[in-house]
Regions:
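N-terminal secretory signal peptides that target proteins for export/translocation
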Residues: 1-4
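Bacterial N-terminal signal peptides
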Residues: 6-16
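Cyclophilin-like peptidyl-prolyl cis-trans isomerases
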Residues: 22-433
Length: 433
């Protein structure tokens, strides 16, 4: 072998060794520590890290890694795994369907969705429907990738979230898509007030922006003179996402909640996200007040993983000006005296008589469409501490999960499906356990 060939082979060997030494291994995703729980529960089976498959060019991704968790979430929510082989993919349906192209869209577009025509030959129509069932706009004979700003006029000036429904003939198809304009809420106007039959004071909300909550209240006129004008509202973009209900499984039965992004978009999205990601699992209803001091139906409150009434998600939400009335079955955010202090704790109203005074003071963001027996059963839980509303045995929230919402129908307000109570104040609710 010539000296030239020997030198070339030696240099090649040195280059390969150096290249291998400088290539870091892909670190394995750590298994998270189990979260602390307020009550003793059986320890879960430890997660077994899969062994490395030496036939692969990359390490096997651990089953608990963020990559796999996100893939499974998308599979559950969209009913299709984009990374699965073509032969094993599960179709959403054989009929027509639609999906958002992305979650966030810029204010001037494109605002796109993907429409699958399906097997039927009849043309498809898109309807933009508000919460009252009024059709705000429509586009006919649509399919493929559609820019909504080009086919539905007025969508760029939406003030509240609306629902995009796919229709074939006279039949709505599948789950609607929420079209939510991203707007900052107007500044909240407050004053110090005294609670009825008490000397205690609290922060009372009296208006939003330049609009008072009670235009007939003469005391607000002086307050309005001190209000500093906020920035004019603008649309910073859009959120587009599949409409989902939240199924709350408790040891008293199930409660199905329809969200109201048209009233409180950020609050509804926060609750949906915490529910989807398991924040509420194994928490409970730590405060049960079936009736207030005047005997009027009041609230059941939950959403605190510590079950103390002081826990939360580690952040606070800006209060939103929801006008959804606090009626039986309506879900709203609990908070401290500071208006922008809500996080994860929520409550269900038990009756208009006792909770009408909460309108405008607390942010209602949805309503139960099934589960009145469970709500009434929780409200009938024996109380150990009446002053605090502390139950003797805290009703447990086993899990929460997202389920696809039903189609939106023109001319129909889904709030008509809100649950009705099965009992009267003072009666014992029939348990659904």
């Amino acid at each position: 072998m010539s000296n030239t060939i020997q030198i070339a082979l030696l240099l090649t060997f040195v280059f390969v060794v150096n290249a291998q030494a400088q290539s870091p291994e892909i670190p394995a995703s750590p298994i998270p520590e189990p979260a602390a729980v307020p009550t003793a529960r059986p320890a879960a089976n430890p997660v077994q890290r899969p062994e490395r498959d030496t036939t692969r060019t990359r390490p096997v991704v651990p089953a608990d890694s963020p990559e796999v968790t996100e893939r499974l979430r998308r599979f559950r929510e969209n009913t299709i795994d984009p990374n699965a082989p073509q032969s094993t993919r599960v179709p959403v349906t054989k009929s027509a369907s639609m999906r958002p192209a992305r979650l966030y869209c810029p204010p001037h577009g494109p605002l796109e969705i993907n429409i699958r025509r399906g097997d039927a030959g009849e043309s498809l129509t898109l309807m933009l429907i508000d919460r009252n069932g009024e059709v705000l706009g429509m586009a006919k004979d649509v399919q493929g990738r559609v820019n909504l700003l080009e086919v539905i006029s007025g969508i760029d000036s939406l003030e509240h979230a609306a629902w995009l429904q796919l229709v074939q003939g006279d039949h709505p198809l599948g789950t609607p898509i929420v079209i939510q304009p991203i707007r900052e809420p107007p500044p909240v106007r407050t004053t110090r007030a005294t609670r009825p039959n008490s000397t205690a004071t609290f922060t009372k909300i009296i208006g939003w922006g330049d609009r008072p909550l009670d235009a007939d209240d003469p005391t607000i006129d002086e307050e309005r003179k001190t209000w500093i004008a906020g920035d004019p509202p603008i649309i910073s973009g859009f959120k587009t996402y599949t409409d989902m209900d939240v199924l709350i499984r408790t040891d008293h039965g199930e409660i199905l909640v329809a969200l109201a992004p048209d009233e409180a978009p950020s609050t509804a999205w926060n609750f949906r996200t915490l529910a989807r990601d398991g924040f509420y699992d194994q928490s409970g209803f730590h405060r049960v007040v079936p009736a207030d001091r005047e005997g009027k139906p009041f609230v059941i409150q939950g959403g605190d993983p510590t079950l103390t009434g002081n826990g939360g998600p580690g952040f606070a939400l800006a209060l939103e000006p929801s006008t959804l009335p606090h009626e039986y079955g309506v879900i709203s955010m609990a908070r401290a005296d500071e208006p922008h202090s809500a996080g994860s704790q929520f409550f269900f109203a038990l009756g208009r008589e006792g909770t009408a005074r909460l309108d405008g003071q607390y942010c209602s963001f949805g309503y139960a469409v099934s589960g009145s027996r469970a709500v009434d059963s929780i409200a009938a839980t024996p109380i150990a501490d009446i002053a605090e509303g502390r139950p003797a045995n805290i009703p447990v929230i086993l899990t929460m999960q997202l389920v696809t919402a039903p189609a939106r129908m023109p001319g129909i307000d889904r709030r008509q499906d809100r649950i009705k109570t099965t009992t009267k104040v003072g009666e014992v609710a029939p348990t659904s356990r």
